């Protein structure tokens, strides 16, 4: 059997990325898809202008803040309800239905409701939390269900209560799944924050996207969109590193 060396695919991934960026630049410069698809160099020129750069960076900070709060709130809600589902199995059907219902309804449809209830400042955080809740709940609930039964039964036989066995066996075993849920939820949290900013928030990348679209500032629109992608990827990469640490530390 031939085994690939660790990281052996990195040069291929880098080459693919460079090829994609070169193709984007060539298509943008050729005008093949019109002015709505600018070259990367044109988009990068937006950051040369001090006013545009400061606007985008302030908006990025606001969106990242909303997404961070939303991811945290979604994670707390998912953590509490998944643990409740594991400790009290009678609640499982209802909590599973709640998670499915939140996932089935498009997040953007909640926007007008939360504008009235929570206000424009809080709506990006709430939509971000809703977007993050489902993947974290499903991942953690699955991890708790497949926790090692033998170790749990041994703890109970040795006199541990159900709650104590949960804290000593089930939850530590499910931690890698919980972090995996965080990793999968992070891009959705950013998207939820951006969608929430479309409903009247005063600041954020979503506001810049709408403003750029209305004023036909195509390069600035693309710059804001690429910052959203960068923010999502950065969160995913950081949480992937945390997931590897959790897997090495707690995986059975």
Regions found by a protein language model. Give the residues of each.
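Generic hydrophobic transmembrane alpha-helix motif, especially the helices
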Residues: 100-135, 142-146
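Transmembrane-helix boundary motif in ABC transporter permease subunits
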Residues: 69-99, 112
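Transmembrane alpha-helical segments of polytopic membrane transport and secretion proteins
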Residues: 1-18, 237-252
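Transmembrane alpha-helices
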Residues: 126-130, 163-196, 222-223, 235, ...
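Periplasmic/extracellular loop-to-transmembrane helix junction in inner-membrane transport proteins
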Residues: 2-5, 29-73
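Glycine-rich helix-loop "coupling/hinge" segments at transmembrane-helix boundaries
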Residues: 116, 191-228, 247-252
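Short cytoplasmic-facing helical segments at TM-TM junctions of multi-pass membrane proteins
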Residues: 139-184, 205, 209
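C-terminal transmembrane helix and the adjacent membrane-cytosol boundary/short C-terminal tail
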Residues: 89, 145, 176, 180, ...
């Amino acid at each position: 059997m031939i085994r690939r060396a660790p990281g052996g695919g990195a040069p291929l991934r880098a080459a693919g990325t460079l090829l994609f960026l070169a193709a984007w630049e060539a298509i943008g410069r050729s005008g093949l898809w019109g002015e709505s698809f600018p070259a990367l160099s044109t988009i990068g020129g937006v950051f040369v202008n001090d006013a545009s750069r400061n606007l985008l960076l302030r908006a990025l900070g606001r969106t990242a803040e909303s997404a961070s709060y939303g991811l945290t709130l979604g994670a707390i809600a998912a953590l509490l309800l998944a643990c409740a589902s594991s400790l009290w199995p009678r609640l499982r059907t209802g909590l599973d239905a709640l998670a499915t219902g939140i996932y089935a309804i498009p997040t953007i449809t909640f926007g007008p409701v939360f504008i009235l209830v929570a206000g424009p400042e809080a709506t990006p955080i709430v939509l971000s939390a809703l977007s993050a809740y489902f993947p974290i709940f499903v991942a953690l609930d699955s991890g708790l269900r497949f926790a090692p039964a033998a170790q749990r039964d041994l703890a109970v036989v040795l006199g541990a209560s159900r709650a104590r066995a949960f804290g000593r066996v089930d939850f530590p075993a499910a931690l890698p799944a919980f972090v995996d849920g965080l990793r999968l939820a992070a891009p959705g949290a950013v998207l939820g924050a951006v969608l929430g900013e479309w409903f009247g928030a005063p600041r954020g990348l979503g506001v810049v996207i709408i403003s750029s679209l209305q004023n036909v500032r195509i390069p600035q629109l693309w710059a804001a969109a690429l910052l959203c992608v960068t923010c999502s990827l950065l969160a995913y990469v950081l949480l992937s590193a945390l997931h590897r640490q959790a897997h090495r530390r707690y995986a059975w």
